[in-house]
UniProtKB/Swiss-Prot annotation:
One annotated Gene Ontology cellular component of this protein: cytosolic small ribosomal subunit
One Gene Ontology molecular-function label: rRNA binding
Keywords annotated in UniProt: Ribonucleoprotein, Ribosomal protein, RNA-binding, rRNA-binding
Subunit structure: Part of the 30S ribosomal subunit.
Lineage: Archaea, Methanobacteriati, Thermoplasmatota, Thermoplasmata, Thermoplasmatales
Family annotation (NCBIfam families): PRK08572.1 (NF006345), uS17_arch (TIGR03630)
Described purpose of this protein according to its UniProt entry: One of the primary rRNA binding proteins, it binds specifically to the 5'-end of 16S ribosomal RNA.
InterPro entries: NA-bd_OB-fold (IPR012340), Ribosomal_uS17 (IPR000266), Ribosomal_uS17_arc/euk (IPR028333), Ribosomal_uS17_archaeal (IPR019978)
Family: Belongs to the universal ribosomal protein uS17 family.
Pfam families: Ribosomal_S17
Protein name per its UniProtKB record: Small ribosomal subunit protein uS17
GO BP terms, alphabetized: translation
Gene: rps17
Length: 109
């Protein structure tokens, strides 16, 4: 099967899939933000929860606080993930009520 170039500098998946919401083997286009995070939960069907940690400066206390933002992401069949993996995910059109990101690369092996 043909693997599309999605326009990002990421490693292509080795396996193939028939998922229509796959950016490589389906018709889903990615645009907008490209983020990196850690998989917290992969219990949903073809979906996962990815968390990103960032530091926010609080002027009143003159300190930085660590915040966590969770994203619901679509997992194509050609990318295998498990909780604890670091992944790169990109913004796409809305696929469900809370899912508007898709995993494009597994960063660590």
């Amino acid at each position: 099967m043909y693997t599309r170039n999605i326009g990002l500098d990421v490693k292509l998946p080795e396996s193939e899939c028939n998922d229509p919401h796959c950016p490589y083997h389906g018709k889903l286009s990615v645009r907008g933000q490209v983020l990196t995070g850690k998989v917290v939960s992969a219990n949903m069907t073809k979906s996962a929860v990815v968390a990103r940690e960032y530091q926010q400066y609080i002027p009143k206390y003159e300190r930085k606080a660590t915040k966590i933002k969770k994203y619901h992401v679509h997992v194509p069949d050609c990318i295998k993930i498990k909780p604890g993996d670091t992944v790169r995910f990109a913004e796409c059109r809305k696929l469900a009520k809370t899912i508007s990101f898709v995993i494009v690369e597994k960063v660590n092996q």
